[in-house]
């Protein structure tokens, strides 16, 4: 026990080590506070949805006047959907920083609404906003290098190693004990602030333990690299430069090159292209005979084929029908997009076994439900809800049932938990 206490005292007597531990603690706290503030801001925005939707619906309802046309209601009313953050999302913001977490949809063509502004390429975990995942993935290795690069060379350069070898000591155990103390100190400085904030955010105990275990494993990886370099017998300056170069390659260059390789190996149609194709299909419907549009719609949705035929005047059921036909027209593009995104995500996850920084990001965002899979699941919930909206308004339009002001409040409401 005295030997362990001696290692702790010796580490704390080093100004560099003490300053590094203090700085790491401050950065960990700052990253956690930043993540909590960002998620609190999103929760506040989501909490305001109900009141804002009620105001918007009241305005649309007031403008409805004496009309009994459900098509006007379907066209002018927006219906909010939202993707609430998980308790752990403060630690790994992930996709929530680049993908919409609130989406207002109408009972018109959905794919253009979903894919508007979909210009990001988040399939591979790379450097992003400053959060706890960023700290662990990119900054923590630098602190490991700062404390471990001279774990042996410092003794050699001061001549203490020769003296220590003359004593009845096992040098391997001495350096192992020293490395353990330094890694434990780094783990505590990064993990203790996380533990406090995670408990305050009511994160599940299993997730807290998983994050702490993940951080410990990541520390061991970088500590192992440092020990491999230290045992080469180089001086401290060469060790530091070598380890810094390894950090650049493993944490920055490697993931960036892998990202380029994955994008080239698995081409994916951009979401903006899907939105454009859907709009082109919708706009082209104005030049197609209405009977052809309805025939195509009834072939796909036979439950509405008994609807009264169109008259000479404009009818919203034709308008909503060709919007749905537009969605159906781009369904193969959407399926290909989804498949490509999932393949890229799987490739990035597999790459995490070769590049630990990528694996760290993938694991953290997966636990926090802020990864691409969580975003795709939100899109699936939006599609399910949009189908409910369409069925609701179709029930009026395709049976020529009058739509009155109280019917606005009877429209389906989005359930984020479904």
Language model features with spans:
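Hydrophobic residues within alpha-helical transmembrane segments
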Residues: 22, 180, 184, 188, ...
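Hydrophobic/aromatic residues in alpha-helical transmembrane segments
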Residues: 144-148, 224-225, 241
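Long, hydrophobic alpha-helical segments
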Residues: 127-158
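Hydrophobic alpha-helical transmembrane segments that constitute the membrane-spanning cores
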Residues: 111-112, 173-202
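Alpha-helical transmembrane segments of multipass membrane proteins
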Residues: 27, 31, 185, 189, ...
